[in-house]
Every structure is written in C-alpha cells, then in structure tokens.
C-alpha cells in the first residue's frame, strides 16, 4: 500500500510561511509520497517559491510537483522550478518519473495541462493565430501525458498529476461561463487510452472533489475543495490492477 498526500493551490508566500511549514512538518508520518498539483506560489515570485522550498527541504519522503497558472504570472516560472528542484522536489513538466515507494514501483506523469473546455463548450482549432495557438498548446500537453504514460507503463501504480482539470465533473460548482478556462477534456483522451490508477489536479477552487475518466478516478485536490492542507489516498495494487482508497484529510 502507498499512502499519497495530495494538495493543490497551496499559494505559498511569506504571509503563509507558518501554515505551509507546519503542514509539511506534520505530513511525513502520515504519507509515503507527496504530490502537489500546481499553483505552488501566490503570484509566481521566486521569494514565494522559497517559502515552499524551505518547507520541503528536509522532507524525508519524495515530493512531486507541477506548476500552475499562478506560478507563471511573474514570468519567473523557470526560477520557481529551479528553487524547488534545488530543495529536492521532483518538478514535472511534460515529463514522467518512477521511484520505489513502500516496496512498489510508482510512476508519476506530470504536466500543467491547459484550457479548452468540455463537451458543449470547447475552443475549436479555428480563427485567429492566437486562438489556434491556445488549441495547439493544449494538444501539446495532452501529447506529453500520452508519452509519459508510455514511459511508466511497467510501473506497479501510475498517477497523472495536473493543474488544470481533465474532466468537467471536478469543476462543477464554478460558474459555467469559466469552465472553458478551468481545463479540457482533451487532457482525458490519453489517460483513457493508456490507463492510469489515479488522476489528481487543482485549479478549480469552487469545484467538486471527485470525477472519473471511464473507471479511472479523478480528484480535485485544491485545498479550497478538500478543506485541508493535504488529502490522503491509499493505493493498493499490482501491475495492471489497483484499488484506490480515499482515506481522508490530514
């Protein structure tokens, strides 16, 4: 069994240093791995990333993370990633990594994802070059998920870590008019094709906790949704089959 502590939209800053450091100090005894689903900082400033880096530096369990839209706002996303990587965080950007956790081979595919909407209201590949580039960017994110899942196909457990939502079910609760900005069902296509045991994302602060891609569970782990610093998932499985238990808050 692997215990996964997941959180999205931590929005670290100097103002939240105490809460962030306390949350990470407590979680080590409750989890085997930590997954962070983007919006690691408030506005993407390196000084804000340093707060999270300080909290992660002495963590003895693996920490995986993807960036979110807030982490790009200041134009310093590369610096944010570098600071966290220097502190030992496995930063995933259209990439995948495998590691041994609790006696099992865990594979994590991580990328930010992007916008585009869901059936009934989607951005088409049509019109001005800027709009078509948005469509193309989401396609590149989906392609990265597919490639990552190919790379971790032999892992005992496979997780997809995103910021933007791949299903509309987990953004329900947000105004319908902004669903197109909260994710894209195109991100779900490679997950449905190649399979995964668990999909995690954030971004939709007023969204819903649970959805599915076929039989694959999808969870919105934004702290505003879970109401806790971390949510613990218990995964038990063997290659080709797994069971996910939602243990609860930590």
What are these regions (language model features)?
Residues 6-8, 34-39, 63-69, 90-95, ...:
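Active-site neighborhood of phospho(di)ester-bond hydrolases with catalytic His/Asp-centered motifs
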Residues 11-16, 41-46, 70-80, 98-101, ...:
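Active-site environment of divalent metal-dependent phosphoester hydrolases
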Residues 59, 87, 214-216:
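Short, structured coil segments at secondary-structure junctions
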Residues 1, 78, 99-102, 172, ...:
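Binuclear metal-dependent phosphoesterase catalytic core
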Residues 2, 32, 106-108, 157-159, ...:
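Alpha/beta-hydrolase fold active-site loops
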Residues 10-12, 78-179, 222-224, 235-237:
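Conserved catalytic scaffold of divalent metal-dependent phosphoesterases
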